[in-house]
Each structure stands twice: as C-alpha cells, then as structure tokens.
C-alpha cells in the first residue's frame, strides 16, 4: 500500500492506494493525527507534498520509506514554466492528476482552496502554467480586514446576483466574481484549445460545480491521484 499526503495551508489530506486504485481518503487539521493514522497503516511508501518543513514528518521515517515532492523529483510530465523552482507542489500534483485521468487531452483544472489557481496541461503532457488569485475565504477576509465597516461574511451556495444588503453585496461580489473569473478562463481556453476538459478540485469546488455553464469534472482527489502517479514513477 502507498499513502500520499497533501499538506495544504489549512488542512492535510491523505489517500491510500493499492494496486493503483484509491482505497480511502481522510482529512485532518492536526499533523499529529496524520502521523498516527499513517503509522497504523504501515504502508510500503509514503509520498508527501507539503508547504511545511520536511522535518515535521521525520517520525514516519522510522516505520516506512518517506519521499517528498520537490524540485529534484522526476515527473511523468514536462514543465514549461519560466520559474520552475517557484512552482507549487500542489499545482504539479494537480497537473499530473489531470494527465493521469485524461491522458492525451487538453486539460484545464481549477483548484479552489486557500487560493484560486488554474493550470493547463496540453495533449503532449506539458504543463504550461496558469494563474493564482485569492480564494473564497481570502476575499471575504480581505474585505473585512482592509475596510472599516464591511462585515466578515461566510459563503453560501446561492449568492444573489444583485445584493440587497451589504452582506448580500459582498456575497455577490465574491462568489459571482469567482464564477465569472472561472467561466472567463474556460471560454478563453476553449477558443484556443478544442476539445478541452475542465476539472474542479479543492475544498470550495462544491460552491461552484452546479453554477458553471460548461460541463466539468469535479474530482476531489485530483492532487492525491497525481501524487500517487509521481510516486509510482519514482519507485
């Protein structure tokens, strides 16, 4: 069994793979709980994509082989990016996940987490880059933090088109703004690359999956699938 770990800014998601198939996933907020869960499984390999220091996972090295996704890791895709040393491992994992699920295709993927990112990987499995902008909670918090009177608002699945209150106007601006941002990118890529798959992942993907006009694939485990593919490519 392989276990892959995707450490984000707020949560840690782990997935167990056996025979190339995803068996289960779990999400944690505390690193201690992750270490306990992995140690209990006794996997053959552990592969980690993390925004934290590698020493945080040193306890796992006593029970199994631990590998980290970094700039030295061999990848099953090519990277066409001017600053590859700054490319986030989460974006690499998502790109590999897209190419694994839809090989030989143009794939446009959006990760709706702390940040809203998009990436594009072409039919030749070349990741060409994408964009980074504030995510849902970051936009709400920025409006409350950088103004005197605007309240902190929580996301709802059905924001109004026309806000009839300050909270409603914020809801409309943030959620409709993100929707139109995503749809704008989709249209621009469709005009240049046909056909193209559109994938959504990340904790806030559920807020938008039914609101986008174009057919999309919502794949919560996209990064985990990519990490397992990279692990198998290296061991």
Curated annotation (Swiss-Prot):
Pathway involvement of the protein, from the record: Cofactor biosynthesis; coenzyme A biosynthesis; CoA from (R)-pantothenate: step 1/5
Location in or out of the cell: Cytoplasm
EC number of the protein: 2.7.1.33
Obligatory cofactor(s): NH4(+); K(+)
Entry binding sites for ATP: 6-13, 114
Residues annotated for substrate binding in this entry: 81, 88-91, 166
Enzyme class: transferase
HAMAP family: Pantothen_kinase_3 (MF_01274)
Keywords on record: ATP-binding, Coenzyme A biosynthesis, Cytoplasm, Kinase, Metal-binding, Nucleotide-binding, Potassium, Transferase
Main location (coarse class): cytoplasm
Gene of this entry: coaX
GO biological process, any: coenzyme A biosynthetic process
Quaternary context: Homodimer.
InterPro entries hit by this protein: ATPase_NBD, Type_III_PanK
Protein's UniProt name: Type III pantothenate kinase
Single Gene Ontology MF annotation: ATP binding
Family, similarity comment: Belongs to the type III pantothenate kinase family.
Role summary: Catalyzes the phosphorylation of pantothenate (Pan), the first step in CoA biosynthesis.
GO CC terms: cytoplasm
Catalytic reaction annotation: (R)-pantothenate + ATP = (R)-4'-phosphopantothenate + ADP + H(+)
Active site: 90
Cofactor note: A monovalent cation. Ammonium or potassium.
């Amino acid at each position: 069994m392989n276990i892959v770990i995707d450490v984000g800014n707020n949560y840690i998601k782990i997935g167990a793979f056996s025979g190339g198939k995803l068996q289960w996933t779990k999400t944690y907020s505390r690193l201690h709980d992750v270490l306990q869960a992995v140690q209990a499984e006794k996997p053959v390999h552990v592969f980690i994509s993390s925004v934290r220091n590698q020493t945080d996972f040193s306890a796992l090295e006593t029970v199994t082989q631990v590998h980290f996704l970094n700039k030295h890791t061999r990848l099953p895709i090519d990277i066409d990016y001017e600053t590859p040393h700054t490319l986030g491992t989460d974006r690499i994992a998502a790109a590999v996940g897209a190419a694994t699920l839809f090989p030989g295709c143009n794939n446009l993927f959006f990760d709706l987490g702390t940040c809203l990112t998009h990436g594009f990987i072409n039919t030749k499995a070349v990741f060409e880059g994408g964009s980074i902008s504030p995510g849902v909670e970051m936009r709400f918090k920025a409006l409350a933090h950088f103004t005197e009177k605007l309240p902190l608002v929580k996301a709802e699945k059905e924001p109004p088109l026309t806000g009839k209150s300050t909270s409603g106007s914020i809801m409309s601006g943030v959620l409709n703004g993100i929707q139109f941002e995503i749809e704008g990118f989709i249209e621009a890529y469709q005009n240049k690359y046909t056909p193209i798959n559109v994938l959504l992942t990340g904790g806030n993907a559920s807020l938008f999956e039914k609101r986008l006009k174009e057919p999309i694939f919502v794949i919560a485990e996209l990064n985990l699938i990519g990490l397992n593919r990279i692990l198998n490519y290296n061991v």
